[in-house]
Amino acid sequence: IKPLQKLSTSVIQEFINDIFLVKSPLSDKPLARESVVGIRRDLSAILRKAMMLKYISLNPVTGTRIPRATKNLDEEKTVVFSKEQVQQLLSFVKGTPQEAWYSLILDGTLRRGEALGLTWQDVDFDKGTIKVRNNWVEGANDVLEMTTPKSLSSIRTIKLTDNTMRLLRKENIRYKEYKLKNPDFVDSQRVIFMNNGKPWIPKSFYRKYKRTLEEAGLPPISLHGLRHTGITLQLEAGANIKAVSNRAGHSDIQITFDIYTHLTKNMEQETVDIIENILSPAVNN
């Protein structure tokens, strides 16, 4: 353990680089970039407090950066659902609030914090859009807080499908009914809410999602994987990659290219199969 005075920017940067290699106890996979960003933010807040108390003169976190994580593309293939698995999940939760929740994340390609931070004021039922401008996270000492999204590009307006908007309208009606019937209802105004009106604790929401996957007989793909699934399905359907990147809130279109490069391999094989089906009869005759 180093004394506070010996915590240099280079030491903190080395620590940040190292935690990219740490595996999450929930998924047994490397920590998501958002988790590393949160750790850096919390560490900066702690050391800022140390500055105020005159223990250190400078915050060593200032000047550090979050490196771009390198991912194995073979592993990347395993973190998304197939079209059939998406249908299986949505069929399993049909008629429950979870149908709206997971449709929202898939359709809007939302991060967990963005989805849980969405309020009814962010939903425009007339235009069929949502405004992503909040991030509901667990900060230092597990304190829940509403922050701004991870980057300027993450603040965005997203047009949703008619089906997702229909599900959100049902959830809005459910919210209002619960509010009228329950005098102890907490008017959090969250789109994704617990039955008592309170917003979900991110970890609790994740555990509920994981239990649902298990009950539905689906692989334990993370919520971030659900977001990736939404992006992947849009790209596979032929959507413009720039439009998909903007919709996902990626700060750089290269991020979209890097993560979903494996799609071009899938599409190439599909193209070969199509050509083979066309030419094979001619060759055999």
PLM segments and residue spans:
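Proline-centered turn/helix-capping motifs that create local helix->coil transitions or kinks
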Residues: 51-62, 125-128, 134, 140-141, ...
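Short, polar N-cap/turn motifs at the start of nucleic acid-interacting alpha helices
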Residues: 122-129, 239-261
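C-terminal secondary-structure termini that scaffold catalytic or DNA-interacting sites
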Residues: 127, 138-155, 159-164, 170, ...
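Active-site/catalytic core of tyrosine-dependent DNA strand-transfer enzymes
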Residues: 83-86, 161-218
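C-terminal catalytic core of tyrosine-transesterase DNA break-rejoin enzymes
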Residues: 52, 103, 107-114, 204, ...
